[in-house]
Regions:
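N-terminal membrane topogenesis motif
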Residues: 1-5, 59, 66, 188-190
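Signature of the first transmembrane helix
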Residues: 1-44, 84, 139, 163
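Alpha-helical transmembrane segments of multi-pass membrane transporters
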Residues: 4-11, 79-84, 129-152, 169-170
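Transmembrane-helix boundary and interhelical linker motifs in polytopic inner-membrane proteins
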Residues: 17-21, 35-70, 120-125
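Residue-level recognition of transmembrane alpha-helices
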Residues: 26-29, 68, 72, 103, ...
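Alpha-helical transmembrane segments of multi-pass membrane proteins
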Residues: 34, 77, 84-88, 92-117, ...
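Membrane-interface junctions at transmembrane-helix termini in multi-pass inner-membrane proteins
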Residues: 53, 107-129
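Interhelical loop/hinge segments that connect adjacent transmembrane helices in multipass membrane
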Residues: 125, 152-159, 168-190
Length: 190
């Protein structure tokens, strides 16, 4: 799905938004990607390993998931501070504030996404179905709403939703791993 959908969307988007609109969204995506990477702090890779290791111990799994989620949210707040400082201080970025604010939701949605938990628990069918469903919805939204050169912010929002809305579903679906009460203290050092 990561290869097929761009093959369908790119010709349409480049014809409608032209190089200028596509370039604005690509620059915003690149900037957000760096801050999202900082916010994630390697947690996805570590989270897969830890959740796979403790998946048979429910209490340990709940604790590890909570600890990693808290760390991820704290790092996202720090990353947001740096991101918005940069957006408002650099004129080229400040001129496109709306686009950069819309694109910044990627940082938040990635922090609550906890896809690493599902990979650690080897729930690949869920991951695949969810990912394809949201990409199809985004494809439909793209063809319905992006019709003019000025729709580049809307295109940015749709691309964020295509990539990150599944993280909201992950968070809602993971309530059995996050919102259970753990009877041991959280340990942020492991």
């Amino acid at each position: 799905s990561s290869i097929i959908f761009p093959l369908i969307t790119f010709p349409y988007v480049s014809r409608i938004l032209l190089p200028e609109g596509v370039g604005k969204v690509s620059l915003a995506t690149s900037v957000v990607s760096y801050f999202s990477l900082i916010a994630q702090l390697g947690i996805p890779t570590y989270g897969i390993r830890v959740s796979a290791k403790v998946r048979d111990n429910k209490e340990e799994l709940v604790s590890c998931t909570q600890e990693l989620l808290i760390i991820n949210i704290i790092m996202s707040v720090i990353s947001y501070i740096g991101y918005f400082s940069m957006v408002f201080l650099i004129d080229k970025l400040a001129n496109e504030k709306c686009l950069y604010i819309v694109m910044s939701t990627t940082i938040l949605l990635n922090s609550i996404g906890i896809e690493w938990l599902y990979k650690g628990l080897e729930q690949y069918t869920y991951i695949t179905i969810r990912s394809i469903a949201f990409k199809i919805l985004a494809l439909i939204a793209l063809f319905l709403f992006v019709h003019q050169r000025s729709d580049y912010v809307l295109y940015g929002a749709i691309s964020v939703l295509a990539a990150s809305l599944s993280n909201v579903l992950n968070f809602i679906n993971a309530r059995k791993y996050i919102f259970q009460r753990s009877y041991r203290k959280l340990q942020f050092r492991r």
